[in-house]
Amino acid sequence: MTSHTHPASVTYSNHIKRLIEVYENAINIISTNSSGPSSHIESVLIHSGCEGHYFGDDRGIPFQAYGHFSHWLPINQPYQFLHIRAGEKPVYFQIIPSDFWYEQNIDLPDWCSEQFQLVTLTAANQLPQHLQGKGIAYLGEPTELLNSLGLSEDMLNPPALLHYLDFNRAYKNEYELEQLRAANKLAVAGHSAARECFLKGGNEFQIHMAYLNACEILENECPYTNIVALDEKSAILHYQHKRRGSGANSRVLLIDAGCRVNGYSSDVTRTSVRPGVNPLFQQLLIKMEQLENDLVSLVKPNINYTELHTYTLWAIAELLIDLRICRSNAADLLEREIPQLFMPHGVGHLLGVQVHDVGGHQADHNGAIMLPPAHSPALRNTRELSQSMVFTIEPGFYFIPLLLEPERNGDRAELFDWTLIDELYSCGGVRIEDNICVTSSGAENLTRQFEAGS
């Protein structure tokens, strides 16, 4: 298949054209509205990042390229550089060391490489002799090269430039949506295999391996550490272990796991139960599935993401009353911030080349910040929804002893049915998460479209 017939050839070309336009607009706006060194930016040099090692060891830490580099190139290698100049083809400085210890070749498909002027070097210290002109802004992890490049600290990750670029990362073009759909399709296959393993009595380690095998990925190729939690461990929001003990008696699985395709990440969570689970928890799972679907149906342009979070807290307050986990009424529980004890996280976040993508609290490209409400400081997204914006929707409901036990002898103790809560601690919690793109009139669910029966 030639580059011109590859499915990504046209959309990737348009993606690069769009990025060039964004960067040129950023430079023009900054030069007009800023003072100091930032007003003299003429081009941008992006560094993929440095290779790290564990302290006192020569073993390398798994590398993750800088997000603004990954936005341009699907290359996850350290010491790569991209130079963007107004009106010219971007230059990709491909650093390939002469090395017999490790594989250093970079497999760049034709449909990708043809968008760049490619300059191959054997070491990053050869870079300065190939850079011409002044006013170079540097984005990424600092290196010793900065001195030889003659860049001032004011041109290192200039805030005005980052504000503009971070804000625009929320909006995805067709190439980006193609990668996100592919990443979701892979993740859905992995989740299906994980659920099947769980239903057969698999333990956390076996479920984790079933996911990796179905997706045909290595652990360090995951966009984040897979959360594979059985029973009470599902109340630990970012549970990181994979227990190898028997899973035969487990009743609840919460798995939060994604995939990465050409740098773009999916972030999908499913909760499953086995026969014998607490009937009330089974009811809770059904109602949380419905809540997640309801939230997706509310997505449309020109509403604020915070509204979705507020709706979620109200729905959880109603669930607490309906399931008789709490007493009083939903309005009272909401006023007294009881739902936050059962869902202490936000209802989602922006998604792209980073799982928790940048710019979630920005009001505009100048860097003005919209803080989350005081009652929900963990909310990662406060943006107004616009067409082509991609984020997660992930309501959760957990029985977390660390949050609930202080209430047992506190001023609000009478609100809780402690007998029920004690019974439900062993079930852990529920989280349901899909990846969503805002359309002109509603939403595309990038995840559910790949599930059988959806």
For each of these PLM feature ranges, what is it?
Residues M1-S454:
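Active-site neighborhoods and metal-handling regions in enzymes and metal-associated proteins
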